Swiss-Prot record:
InterPro entries: C-type_lectin-like (IPR001304), C-type_lectin-like/link_sf (IPR016186), C-type_lectin_CS (IPR018378), CTDL_fold (IPR016187). SUPFAM superfamilies: C-type lectin-like (SSF56436). It is found in: Secreted. GO terms for molecular function: carbohydrate binding; phospholipase A2 inhibitor activity. GO terms for cellular component: extracellular region. Disulfide bonds join 83-160, 138-152. Expressed by the liver. Coiled coil: none annotated. Belongs to the alpha-type phospholipase A2 inhibitor family. This is Phospholipase A2 inhibitor clone 09. It comes from Lachesis muta muta. Glycans are attached at residue 122.
Length: 166
């Protein structure tokens, strides 16, 4: 059985290698191969264009993560839903450059926004006297990027974090 299967594969390979431009199957096969090659080239071009824009945006912000606001104001639960629907996340800066990029958005809008602090965090930027759970169980960043405990019911600027893994 294996011998028959191997023979069939060998014959198919020989048939495909010969091209057979004149018969309809050969023409169709050549057309499919040509289409795949065109699609591969288009994909490579799109990937290059995407990476160029992403690198330019990252260069401008100093962070691989992008922080974007839709200028809406909302409570923590609304923010989670909005960011999820947009394909992003609630901001969670892991490094100083990410926190700076996040703070730039807040400074530009002159508003505070929620963020999530991982436990244990590699990076924190708590303001003096913070965290203070008496102020609330959520965390917000001020326009300078300093972190404060906050109520989850505060209406703050909606900012979502986006990052790309390639």
């Amino acid at each position: 059985m294996r011998l028959i299967l191997l023979s069939g594969l060998l014959l198919l390979g020989t048939f495909l290698a010969n091209g057979h431009d004149t018969d309809p199957e050969g023409q169709m096969l050549n057309s499919v191969i040509e289409s795949v090659m065109i699609l591969q080239k288009e994909f490579a071009n799109l990937k290059h264009a995407f990476l160029t824009v992403h690198k330019a945006r990252s260069f401008g912000s100093g962070s691989e993560r992008l922080y974007v606001s839709n200028k809406e104001i909302g409570k923590f639960e609304a923010l989670k839903e909005i960011c999820d629907q947009a394909g992003g996340h609630i901001p969670s800066p892991q490094f100083e450059n990410q926190n700076k990029a996040f703070a730039n958005v807040l400074e530009r809008h002159n508003k505070e926004a929620y963020l999530v602090v991982d436990d244990p965090a590699n990076f924190t930027n708590w303001a003096a006297g913070q965290p203070n759970e008496a102020d609330g169980t959520c965390v917000k960043a001020d326009t300078h990027g300093s972190w404060h405990s906050a109520s989850c019911d505060d209406n703050l600027l909606v900012v979502c974090e986006f990052y790309f893994i390639l």
